[in-house]
Amino acid sequence: MAMLPLFEPKGRVLLVDGHHLAYRTFFALKGLTTSRGEPVQAVYGFAKSLLKALKEDGDVVVVVFDAKAPSFRHEAYEAYKAGRAPTPEDFPRQLALIKELVDLLGLVRLEVPGFEADDVLATLAKRAEKEGYEVRILTADRDLYQLLSERIAILHPEGYLITPAWLYEKYGLRPEQWVDYRALAGDPSDNIPGVKGIGEKTAQRLIREWGSLENLFQHLDQVKPSLREKLQAGMEALALSRKLSQVHTDLPLEVDFGRRRTPNLEGLRAFLERLEFGSLLHEFGLLEGPKAAEEAPWPPPEGAFLGFSFSRPEPMWAELLALAGAWEGRLHRAQDPLRGLRDLKGVRGILAKDLAVLALREGLDLFPEDDPMLLAYLLDPSNTTPEGVARRYGGEWTEDAGERALLAERLFQTLKERLKGEERLLWLYEEVEKPLSRVLARMEATGVRLDVAYLQALSLEVEAEVRQLEEEVFRLAGHPFNLNSRDQLERVLFDELGLPAIGKTEKTGKRSTSAAVLEALREAHPIVDRILQYRELTKLKNTYIDPLPALVHPKTGRLHTRFNQTATATGRLSSSDPNLQNIPVRTPLGQRIRRAFVAEEGWVLVVLDYSQIELRVLAHLSGDENLIRVFQEGRDIHTQTASWMFGVSPEGVDPLMRRAAKTINFGVLYGMSAHRLSGELSIPYEEAVAFIERYFQSYPKVRAWIEGTLEEGRRRGYVETLFGRRRYVPDLNARVKSVREAAERMAFNMPVQGTAADLMKLAMVRLFPRLQELGARMLLQVHDELVLEAPKDRAERVAALAKEVMEGVWPLQVPLEVEVGLGEDWLSAKE
């Protein structure tokens, strides 16, 4: 095989601070995993940064890592780097992969016991400089600024070059002054003490003024007394700090800068394929790029993949800027994109639903068909964006409509190949996700009517309530203050009123005023309840009441939310622009906001709500006979659970018992701990432990199912719904207890929540054509609710049909139950 083009000689040595770069990219790209749930963000980020540097500076390349053994600095100063957070659990495994990548690229890799990477880099840089090379050091570590010279520069990972001129412009210092400056100022990240009371600004000024530490101490009598005292008191720390800051340039290393190594191209290809770095396969030159497409006239043949670009993301509001179609190596571009839509019979492409919504807006009956995003999402629900999918499976998401069309065609073929043999995932694609995208397109284009006048009146009412709450808060505080200022609120609550500080913020360490903290303090002082009410009212006013009228489309007079099909880890739909999921269902103001969603004149809203669907799904998945029997016999699940837990007859269950049982019934689905339960029910911790134990005694197969689900998840790396939808949960095997427990809660909740989502989606797909026959519309899907709109004279028929379809969507061991309501608005339909 030919040598990679990125290794062409440049007369320059590139030194890479491997450990530093790996750690930096680990945090910069948090959340990037393979389809198996394997975290790879550090590997990907490292490879991208390295590749960019190799293309520009890659004649001789040496990658340096810190050795595991402590360095001489740890021996000189035990507290060196002592303040650093523990190494993240995922990092060592990714670091091993990075080293494997370096070896496959044929690059020199060095680790020297007893010395840090800085010392190795410094030695190599000075030696290469002496041999006549130009040197670039890829790092963001400021310790190495002391090495800068005419022939040594630092290449920052963000792409800019740090030279002696840059250093002088930014700090007013020369490279040979850097160690003295660091010795004075110290470095908290490495726990280098510096001189107490002297910060970076003062240290810069002193070194600029006196040139060096040596000269400064020779003229100490000319320094103002307060500074002189600090310097004299800190002489020992200063000497230590200078020793720790100085890098070694004389390590006994053997590196031949003239020797070149050949990369292992087959191994590199296998490595990148294993980690699903499709875009890097192209960038490293290991895959032939797509052949230049032959330009062809519009329109493309039926079945072509489309690419398009909008002026803004929301299809109901966007202008169609460009439209293209790709098919079998030919690229067709529409000269007039909007007119070009009229030549199409369907939409295949990335984000196909969005283009279909825009077409429906223009009066064209175009519906989405195949979408590679849906295939990618089924392979791994972390595949939520075109950029991420292109990066993982090969390609680049650009602004060009033609490139997007070609990418869609390639990705569809790649992803279909990956799904070969995955019959359950393919079934979900063909029977659920693909037809659902057609339903959602029509729902988005239809929208829902909004009573704007009502919202404007509600805004005035809520504004008056907010002002009244403000006055009450100020009266209780004894003076006015800015209720929206976290710092002012902190002072009022904890300093002036003396309330206990329960927690601190992660970033600043200040006393927390979060909702959770205030909830815990609600009984401590009447001001807390008023503040919580104030926050709820202002949040809903600013998020919904005031913005919603502006979102009504001038052409349709309706509100058009966007339904996101590839956004959640469980398979549930989400909505945005606006997000209707976040309107509270049970609070008075949340209900008043729902009142603004109204039916068209002569129509009514039909609202259908799956009753306790997740508990019914749990009964089916666990096979627990007691749980199944309760639902089969139509008994109240919370009353029956309380009866078994407390050892009383169902008639003897009081409201407190039922509340406890209800909290546990739903809490179990989300892994509620005894500590959380004790807080929810205001009972002792020991009693909460006993409650949970009695719950599992009442439903023994639920515990067995949870344990079995976790065991299977640990073995396979993922959990799945009744229909085979997957969620990868690699942290089930984490060593850190809190990380592992969080993964466990996700793992046994997902099959329940995801199955409920699958049932809702399947019901929508089956109900949609039946509604069209009756002239009814599907408007919204929020949580477990489906909101329809029907002509008044057909509303009862529509309601009966929808209930029948939703309850009979799939045979389970327990009946699905749907509550139905009709009304002129969303609120009255639920009452």
Swiss-Prot record:
<comment type="similarity">
    <text>Belongs to the DNA polymerase type-A family.</text>
</comment>
<keyword id="KW-0227">DNA damage</keyword>
<dbReference type="InterPro" id="IPR018320">
    <property type="entry name" value="DNA_polymerase_1"/>
</dbReference>
<keyword id="KW-0238">DNA-binding</keyword>
<dbReference type="GO" id="GO:0008409">
    <property type="term" value="F:5'-3' exonuclease activity"/>
</dbReference>
<feature type="region of interest" description="Polymerase">
    <location>
        <begin position="409"/>
        <end position="831"/>
    </location>
</feature>
<keyword id="KW-0239">DNA-directed DNA polymerase</keyword>
<dbReference type="Pfam" id="PF01367">
    <property type="entry name" value="5_3_exonuc"/>
</dbReference>
<protein>
    <recommendedName>
        <fullName>DNA polymerase I, thermostable</fullName>
        <ecNumber>2.7.7.7</ecNumber>
    </recommendedName>
</protein>
<dbReference type="InterPro" id="IPR019760">
    <property type="entry name" value="DNA-dir_DNA_pol_A_CS"/>
</dbReference>
<keyword id="KW-0269">Exonuclease</keyword>
<dbReference type="GO" id="GO:0003677">
    <property type="term" value="F:DNA binding"/>
</dbReference>
<keyword id="KW-0235">DNA replication</keyword>
<comment type="function">
    <text>In addition to polymerase activity, this DNA polymerase exhibits 5'-3' exonuclease activity.</text>
</comment>
<dbReference type="InterPro" id="IPR012337">
    <property type="entry name" value="RNaseH-like_sf"/>
</dbReference>
<dbReference type="InterPro" id="IPR015361">
    <property type="entry name" value="Taq_pol_thermo_exonuc"/>
</dbReference>
<dbReference type="InterPro" id="IPR036279">
    <property type="entry name" value="5-3_exonuclease_C_sf"/>
</dbReference>
<dbReference type="GO" id="GO:0006261">
    <property type="term" value="P:DNA-templated DNA replication"/>
</dbReference>
<dbReference type="GO" id="GO:0003887">
    <property type="term" value="F:DNA-directed DNA polymerase activity"/>
</dbReference>
<keyword id="KW-0378">Hydrolase</keyword>
<dbReference type="InterPro" id="IPR043502">
    <property type="entry name" value="DNA/RNA_pol_sf"/>
</dbReference>
<dbReference type="GO" id="GO:0001882">
    <property type="term" value="F:nucleoside binding"/>
</dbReference>
<keyword id="KW-0808">Transferase</keyword>
<keyword id="KW-0540">Nuclease</keyword>
<dbReference type="InterPro" id="IPR020045">
    <property type="entry name" value="DNA_polI_H3TH"/>
</dbReference>
<keyword id="KW-0234">DNA repair</keyword>
<dbReference type="Pfam" id="PF02739">
    <property type="entry name" value="5_3_exonuc_N"/>
</dbReference>
<dbReference type="Pfam" id="PF09281">
    <property type="entry name" value="Taq-exonuc"/>
</dbReference>
<dbReference type="GO" id="GO:0006302">
    <property type="term" value="P:double-strand break repair"/>
</dbReference>
<dbReference type="InterPro" id="IPR002421">
    <property type="entry name" value="5-3_exonuclease"/>
</dbReference>
<dbReference type="InterPro" id="IPR029060">
    <property type="entry name" value="PIN-like_dom_sf"/>
</dbReference>
<dbReference type="Pfam" id="PF00476">
    <property type="entry name" value="DNA_pol_A"/>
</dbReference>
<dbReference type="InterPro" id="IPR020046">
    <property type="entry name" value="5-3_exonucl_a-hlix_arch_N"/>
</dbReference>
<feature type="domain" description="5'-3' exonuclease">
    <location>
        <begin position="174"/>
        <end position="258"/>
    </location>
</feature>
<keyword id="KW-0548">Nucleotidyltransferase</keyword>
<dbReference type="InterPro" id="IPR002298">
    <property type="entry name" value="DNA_polymerase_A"/>
</dbReference>
<dbReference type="InterPro" id="IPR036397">
    <property type="entry name" value="RNaseH_sf"/>
</dbReference>
<dbReference type="InterPro" id="IPR001098">
    <property type="entry name" value="DNA-dir_DNA_pol_A_palm_dom"/>
</dbReference>
<dbReference type="InterPro" id="IPR008918">
    <property type="entry name" value="HhH2"/>
</dbReference>
